[in-house]
Amino acid sequence: RHLKFSGLRVERSSFGPGDLSAYWSRYERDDARFIDAAGNERRDVFDLRYAGKRAPFDWDVEAMGQTGHVGAASIGAWAFGALGGYTFASLPGTPRLGLQVDGASGDSHPGNGHVGTFNPLFPNGYYFTLAGYTGYSNLIHVKPSLTFKLAPTLTLMTALGFQWRETAADAVYGQGMAVVPGTAGHGSRWTGMYAQLRADWLVSDNVALALEAVHFNVGDSLRALGARNADYVGMEAKFGW
């Protein structure tokens, strides 16, 4: 299968209180298959991101647009991600109240010769949690969080994540744009929620450990198809040099 990826990226550091970056990329894949289209995929991706910090606030916002075609069908898709926080530096444990909001388009009008499903291309499967239950297509995700610094090198984060489909006309997607069978055009937009508990320990300058637990409660539309609640516990170790 033919696959080609190319692009151009520009960055501007210290743009106000943050860093600004933008890129264009071209994704080419032969014999691509979507629910509503099949053929050679040619997708142009446009991205703009701004991240920074001005105490007590921090933020990281990104917007993406996609055009092109899959076979004879045109592409028009979008996505965004926004993470922000407020740190109470004067309180014990310097708690940080955070909010993450994400969205990725789905195909709201199947059969019209237009593919609206966002393709995350090479996604970070651990973007939401280490459990990696959810893909970044046809998605609305809202996640409030609270983080405490228990020690200079140890932090504890608790969060609740709430998930919907952007449109019920399209499917629920897992990692790698895997379609959950029977979901396209059926059920409600609500797909479920999860609770997350994560501890991060910076052991040394080049060693970091993380322990994470996630409980996912599936929505009724998925439960009707046989899906069940899921629990995940995992540990991650990072070593750098």
Indicate where each model-derived feature is located:
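A short pocket-lining beta-strand/turn micro-motif at the edge of beta-sheets
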Residues: 152-156, 191-197, 203-211, 231-233
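Signature for the C-terminal beta-barrel architecture of outer-membrane proteins
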Residues: 1-111, 149, 169, 182-186, ...
